[in-house]
Amino acid sequence: IVGLPNVGKSTLFNCLSSAKAQAANFPFCTIEPNLGVITVPDERLNKLAEIVHPGRIVPATCEIVDIAGLVKGASKGEGLGNKFLVDPLEDKSVIDTELQLKDLETIESQLTKQKKTAAAGNKDAKTMVTVLEAYKAVLEQGKNARGVTFETKEEQKVAHDLFLLTTKPVLYVANVDEASAKTGNEYSKKVEEIAKEEGAECMVIAAKTEEDIASLETDEDKLMFLEELGLEESGVNRLIKKAYALLNLETFITAGEMEVKAWTYHKGWKAPQCAG
């Protein structure tokens, strides 16, 4: 989870995981990232359990990281001014810029060394230089690296292993008030438009309301709360499913007397790969 301070990141993180991160209305309330484990909702597990009657149900899980709130200048270790006006597009621009600068720093730290090695005839270094320079050219234009594609498997592997921040797939989450939880508002519409232009996913969620829902003890109470808002499913569940799909992850299920268990695999894997 990446975003500016005061936008509901830690509240959202708390809803997604069992951990309780500090949700403070000031910058850098967290310096180190918060780590949590979330369960992937899957209605099939309970249905299978009704048939098999296992000793336990084990859902699929994945890790989630709440990065300390980014601010303009964060890539240089700078702090935050006093600007708290709501402008999601400006927020996005700040985040993009900071991540791009960090990626450029990563690239430039390697490029000089790799050029020297490539000049000596090293084939792998030449591939690395090709990839680094392609990314550098795009980032210097103020664009994210995820738009860069490579033709050869060697280049693709090098690109993957760089783990640049702006190559990662994006799901934009627009945090709104309770009244806008179903349809969004003028601000979330702006985010949806820019996400569509980028071919990215976008969704609306009311993080504070989700926190209230998560605090309810029974599923019946949660369902009643959602019905009052005109929602069929919690925003948290929708978010987890969207993120799971965005990462090209799917699950298969094994069922027996001991347990009904969901296993995570990458979309496109064949059975031997899934079996490990």
Go through each PLM region and give its residues.
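Conserved G1/Walker A P-loop phosphate-binding module
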Residues: 1-92, 96, 107-108, 113-117
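C-terminal-of-GTPase-core extension/linker across diverse P-loop GTPases
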Residues: 1-2, 7, 13, 113-276
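Switch/coupling subdomain of P-loop NTPase systems
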Residues: 86-109, 181, 189-202
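Flexible, active-site-adjacent loop/turn segments at secondary-structure boundaries
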Residues: 21-29, 43-50, 55-56, 68-69, ...
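Generic alpha-helical segment signature
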Residues: 41, 88, 100-103, 125-128, ...
